[in-house]
Amino acid sequence: MPDIKLKNQASLCASTRLFLAYTSIKPFDVAFHPKEPVVFSSLLTGQVCAWSYDDATGETSSSWSVRPSKRTARALSIEENGDEIWMGGKSGSLLCALTPPKVIQLSTRDGSMTRERDSAHECPINRVYCVNRNLVATGDDDGVIKLWDPRQADSIRTYSQHFDYISDFTYFDDKRQLVATSGDGHLSVIDIRSNKSTPLTVSEDQEDELLSIVPIKGGQKAIVGSGLGILSVWNRQMGWADSVDRIPGHPASIDAIVALTPDIIATGSEDGMIRVIQVLPHKFLGVVATHEEFPVERIRLDRNNKWLGSVSHDECLKLTDVEDLFEDSDEDDEMEEDEPDSDEEKSKKKKKDNGMKDMSRGQAENDGSFFADL
């Protein structure tokens, strides 16, 4: 496929609008409502906060805040119908709260708790993932994974193939496979249809912490972020034993990934930057947002693929407009038709098109050699 270019520096800065919902306390996770313009965040204090936002402008207003736990609320996940939000945290408890049909309307039910499972895990829960309406996955600091049916009081299966924290989950519906990444350097695949408490497969040791995962290429492949700043590409048709490609270049750990298109991902890194990268062929496209020197904890894309939500240690939830991030194909066609004839004009055009599209000139200089070896 042809390279997908970001808009030029001036246009990018003008069109990438940032709106901050300050939490005053360190946030750990971010989640978007699947049907409404509402964004949620879990906080160090055990709170879960909700903000409504304008679909067009991104302007936010606080909707509600609850504190279901006195200990850190680490992880959030929302059911596909948008009715309930699940929270896991340092206490090891698993909580479920209502997200009313119109969260922007304050009522006594805003954030009200519907279910609580004390001591769901023996140690802190690090990740929660709603697979579907009747299945929720949780992973803790010891590498234990549990599957839950909301209609039942206890977990339905427990997996212990990992020996370090569970960092992320993703799900492939065609094969009913839940994939988990871990700080022990392995990823594992669980067939949710199986009644056995053993995984379908466990990968080879990648000799690095695996921190994040997201499907790409229409679910044919997956890409995983690591502690050393390397992206690994996994081909499902070739199995999950080992990755098929590696993309070096990030100067710090890749703690979060989202897919913007089937071929384009955004990564949140320990150095505070959110980068956009094209995969197969590999190309670094630019930096679209930054949390300065604070590490990016999580990033999510909203239901319209317009707003990219990110949280960091800078005590704010940031919304970045990524809807018009890439040049329109019509613009590319016009540029090809108006291709300059002289070598001098071609040279000028090449310099203009290949410039790094970072949020500042300094960032562009720092990242100029990024992915230079690809």
UniProtKB/Swiss-Prot annotation:
| Stored Gene3D superfamilies | YVTN repeat-like/Quinoprotein amine dehydrogenase (2.130.10.10)
The family database entries (InterPro entries) matched by this protein are listed as: WD40/YVTN_repeat-like_dom_sf (IPR015943), WD40_repeat_dom_sf (IPR036322), WD40_rpt (IPR001680), WDR55 (IPR017422), WDR55_POC1 (IPR050505)
The biased composition feature labelled Acidic residues covers: 325-344
- Signal peptide from the UniProt entry: none
Q: Which UniProt keywords apply?
A: Nucleus, Repeat, WD repeat
The ranges of the WD repeats are: 21-61, 68-107, 120-158, 161-200, 205-244, 249-287, 290-330
The Swiss-Prot or TrEMBL record describes its family as follows:
Belongs to the WD repeat WDR55 family.
Name by which UniProt lists this protein: WD repeat-containing protein JIP5
Q: Which gene encodes it?
A: JIP5
